[in-house]
Amino acid sequence: MAVRLAKDTMNMQDGIEDGEGAADDDPRFRHEAWAAWPFSQLRTGFRNAEAFWREAAHVPGMTAHHDALTQFFAKQILGMMAPANWLASNPVVLRDAMETHGSHLLKGAQNWLTDVSGVPNPEVTSLPNRFVVGRDVATTPGKVVYRNRLIELIRYEPQTAKVHPEPVFMIPSWIMKFYILDLSPHNSMARYLVGQGHTVYMLSWRNPDASDARLTMDDYLHMGVMDALEVIGQQSGKGVPVHAMGYCLGGTLLTIAAAAMARTGGVAGTRNLPSLKTLTLLAAQTDFSEPGELGLFIDESQIGLLDNMTRGQGYLSGKQMAGSFQFLHSRDLIWTRRMREYLMGEREQPNDLMAWNADTTRMPARMHHEYLTSLYLHNALATSSYRVEDHTVSLSDIHQPVFMVGTQRDHISPWRSVYKLHHLCGAEITFVLASGGHNAGIISEPGHPHRSFQSAIRPAYGPWMEPEQWAKQAKTHEGSWWPAWQQWLAKSSSPKKLARTKTAGTSLGEAPGEYVRVRYAE
């Protein structure tokens, strides 16, 4: 390794840059100014150092987990030292400083002084007022038709004269507020489906407090998914199946529910639940053997540390959780952002997705421990050892058609990990690999620029294909994947009928409900 590093350094001094194209894959070095001397050598030297430490971090005798952890922290240190982060070594910043006669540097210094003095960033503190829930975001008309201790269930009003009989039930992750699926009117997935003639129900998780410390994964399954399904069945009519969709951990919970409902004996305590017609899983993992960088922070010692943190307060706070996600994506969420704020004077312009991301939620202590231990640490769902009501469930019992979406730059649910459902169940799977990341790749409405996706269908009980092989063979499409999904849902639905003008049952208030508005000062 040392010999190769020396050789690369000599080549760099001679103007030879092996793998020149690699720089184009790193957004920090895409600007044409990085091609000029001496910045091209700084860039190449940094790439050589990255390659060296990727290999040097491998220590014989270490477990795979600790080996990956060592590489991760080496990557973090290198990311901090990248030439793009510093005034004297970033040609884009230097050019900007000259063109603006230093005014952007002065503005950046003011931004830095504001941050270090502890004065809240006005761009962040103004988000709740700029993007008000129910006024600017989460505005799709509807009614709250059910409420318990843990959830509210929203039924959106029809926007077409006729609708498909089978409703679509949307289950977001409990880690964040549901309105990621109902952002602004132009990019609301719920509004889009309603506009295409679907009856849509949305699950809204309550933001827990210390009194919820003992809530379990089974509680989230029963009071969340099962109770909501029962209400949907009552309102839709006897014998009408449901298209169920889950996003992130909501999708993981949906697969648990589907497997439990399909096993012999079903789920105790549930009344006349409707059957599931199809499953849609968005950035949802079911096999956690390779969960990406998030898995680096999940082992016995880390879970013990988290348990100590949550034991006293009864929950994991939204601030604690948000810090972990920032650390995972430090290049874009920390260093590149700070470079633009402090060296170029550019504060990020607020948008609806930023407002949603800042609207954090808590997780009950016991449930948080159970989901980390059973899913991430023991990978119980993939090994058919996850227990519901003291009996195991197996994903091999799922036979409904599945529409599954992974995203290319997802650091929370890596697409290759999402793809592993192919070897866990024999159902027909339509797999979509969308451009973008965990959130932006999912909220990819028609008309959004620079969007594309690949897709292919694995027939029921079809042969296994490795992810890389799939990516080489799957057809590429320009634009949003939403229309393809909607067409898939429509094809699996009965012909449209006249929409009901009134919601069956008692209305508990207008959408988006009460639970989504609960915030805590943390």
Predicted regions and their residues:
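Amphipathic, low-complexity, repeat-rich surface-exposed segments
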Residues: 1-150, 163-164, 201, 270, ...
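Alpha/beta-hydrolase-fold enzymes
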Residues: 57-106, 234, 238-239, 253, ...
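Short beta-strand element of the alpha/beta-hydrolase
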Residues: 163-174
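Alpha/beta-hydrolase active-site loop
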Residues: 212-236
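Gly/Ala-rich beta-loop-alpha elbow adjacent to hydrolase catalytic centers
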Residues: 246-250, 254
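Short beta-strand/loop motif that positions the catalytic acidic residue
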Residues: 398, 404-406, 410
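Short alpha-helix in the alpha/beta-hydrolase fold that links the catalytic acid
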Residues: 414-424, 435
